[in-house]
Amino acid sequence: MNEIAEVLPESMKNALSEIPEQQWLEIEEVRIRINRPVELIRRGQPVYLSYAGTAEDAHLILSRLSNYSMYTLEEELKKGYVTIRGGHRVGLAGRVITENGGVKGLRDIASFNIRIARQKLGIAEPLLPYLYQNSWLNTLIIGPPQTGKTTLLRDLARLSSTGKKNMLPVKTGIVDERSEIAGCLRGIPQHQFGQRIDVLDACPKAEGLMMMIRSMSPEVMIVDEIGRMEDTDALLEALHAGVSVIVSAHGWSISDLMKRPSLKRLWEERAFDRYLELSRAKGPGTVSQIYDKDGNVLSRTTGVKTC
């Protein structure tokens, strides 16, 4: 976790260094708050250190995130997060500055949430018989937060751009609005993909889908966390253009999807060939069920863990 250590104060690094290496592999988030104990999220559960964050810690972390020039973080402060080397995302919370009804930036930042990005190579391979049949099937991955949706999408992007035996690599476009799938730093993906990968980083999903089709002629597009009406419109346009799409959405089940006004149309038009439901039954990445385009169960996996 050298990339994370680079932005932390020495005293905090010393406190974190006491954690056994094996436990580090299970930590999903490091949450730092002024005047509160440092919180680690391990297997979805909070673990608190005796070390409490200070105002000086917050100032130093922010300085290191910005390379000691807050001007360079202007756009990131509007979005509320910064992506650092290694693809890790640092969420920020503090006093919001508004202008003309919109968010202009953040000040007095008192909370940091470092989401640890780990690429888990091969986790999507057990799903290939369901998701690839001579070509990639249009797929929606459904799950509540922290169930491994992004990790699974990342490996599917790797597989589609790399190929395997009897599966040729295809031109794969990632529209990465939150810089989480590819973890780009200055436009360069920090995770491992194949030769045929193109990324639109920090780009709104709906606009990015259309931009990618016009500029990069992808055969497969990967998008995380769809949910707005304009996302639905853009996805349908992509499908009509003959592009395969693999996307994710927040939800507990396929029935949740049918109830959401912004996504209901995708179900009604049978936009997807496959639906995957994820849970944390056996940890992040547990595939609970797989459905076909009509909602028929293809696999009751009883908790197959991919991640």
From Swiss-Prot:
Pfam families: Spore_III_AA. ATP binds at residues 143-150. InterPro entries: AAA+_ATPase, P-loop_NTPase, Spore_III_AA, Spore_III_AA_AAA+_ATPase. This is Stage III sporulation protein AA. GO terms for biological process: sporulation resulting in formation of a cellular spore. It comes from Bacillus subtilis (strain 168). The keyword Nucleotide-binding applies. Keywords: ATP-binding, Nucleotide-binding, Sporulation. The lineage of its organism: Bacteria, Bacillati, Bacillota, Bacilli, Bacillales. SMART domains: AAA (SM00382). One of its GO terms (molecular function) is ATP binding.
